[in-house]
């Protein structure tokens, strides 16, 4: 029934922070909330086998923080608020990956931390450039003020920084190097939750910036974004799928499969059409549900046979 808007602290937008829920954000909210409601009861047995007992409280704390960050990114209508929630969810995810009893999880979490920090830096630079040009952080107000500024170099630079930063967070090929180890060595409950939600919310934010803030003409007319996204999508689809064939561990195999599936979603965006965007949004939900279920299944397999090696 339209857009739901809530002004934090009773400060009306664009002066205050606005929570703004429309059809797309409610769609992603349902995905994240549904996955969390399934992973939480599943995690009880998973962490008992894969995380030291004295660290169980850390897992539940970080899961709650990560969920809060992902939901916040989805509902907020403020550009800097998106960055804050992005960092909250990312920092919680780094800790959850490192909680696994396998020592290789520490290296995986460190790799994720380094690449995630680079991505967050690019995002905040992009937000800073947009604030410099528009004088506002409210996404709806920013979209209106950007209309006469299309084609200016700071705005195009902001578009580039946001694209690279969010592509790292979404594991778009070739910025996916953090993902295979993080998914493979994290506890199964963490792999299931992160694979089903974290990259999907990053893709949602990318869509939100492309089609709500910048607008389609800005994204696809001023820069060769369609061609670039198309090449990266195809490379991810075929490259990651090929690498997955040669994996000897099921969690790593499906981690590379996730990179390929992100390529399918980016392929939909690269068309620059309503049909392509709709296809990407549908597959975003589809991939979140199926990949979360697959990693929960792999956790059950690991608990039964003692591992996920082929």
Which residues does each predicted region cover?
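Transmembrane helix-loop-helix hairpins at membrane boundaries of multipass inner-membrane proteins
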Residues: 1-61, 140-144
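Hydrophobic transmembrane alpha-helices and their helix-loop junctions in integral membrane proteins
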Residues: 38-48, 65-80, 93-310
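Short, ordered loop/turn segments at secondary-structure junctions
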Residues: 84
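Short phosphate-coordinating micro-motif centered on Lys-Gly-acidic
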Residues: 87
């Amino acid at each position: 029934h339209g857009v739901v808007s809530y002004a934090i602290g009773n400060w009306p937008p664009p002066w205050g922070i606005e929570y703004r829920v429309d059809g797309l954000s409610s769609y992603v909210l349902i995905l994240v909330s549904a996955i969390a409601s399934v992973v939480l009861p599943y995690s009880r047995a998973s962490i008992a086998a894969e995380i030291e007992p004295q660290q169980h409280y850390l897992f539940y704390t970080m899961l709650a923080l990560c969920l809060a960050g992902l939901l916040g990114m989805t509902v907020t209508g403020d550009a800097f608020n998106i960055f804050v929630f992005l960092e909250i969810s990312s920092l919680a995810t780094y800790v959850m990956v490192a909680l696994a009893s396998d020592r290789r999880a520490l290296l995986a979490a460190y790799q994720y931390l380094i690449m995630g920090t680079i991505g967050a830096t690019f995002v905040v630079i992009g937000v800073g450039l947009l604030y410099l040009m528009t004088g506002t952080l409210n996404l709806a107000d920013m979209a209106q003020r950007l209309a006469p500024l299309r084609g200016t170099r700071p705005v195009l630079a902001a578009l580039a920084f946001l694209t690279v930063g969010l592509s790292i967070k979404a594991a778009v090929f070739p910025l996916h190097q953090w993902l295979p180890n993080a998914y493979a060595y994290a506890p199964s409950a963490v792999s299931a939750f992160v694979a089903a939600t974290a990259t999907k919310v990053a893709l949602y934010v990318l869509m939100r910036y492309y089609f709500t803030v910048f607008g389609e003409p800005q994204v696809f007319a001023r820069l060769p974004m369609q061609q670039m996204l198309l090449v990266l999508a195809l490379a991810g689809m075929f490259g990651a799928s090929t690498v997955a064939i040669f994996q000897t561990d099921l969690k790593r195999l499906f981690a590379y499969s996730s990179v390929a599936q992100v390529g399918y979603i980016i392929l939909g965006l690269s068309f620059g059409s309503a049909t392509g965007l709709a296809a990407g949004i549908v597959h975003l939900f589809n991939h979140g549900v199926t990949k979360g279920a697959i990693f929960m299944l792999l956790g059950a397999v690991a608990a039964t046979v003692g591992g996920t090696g082929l």
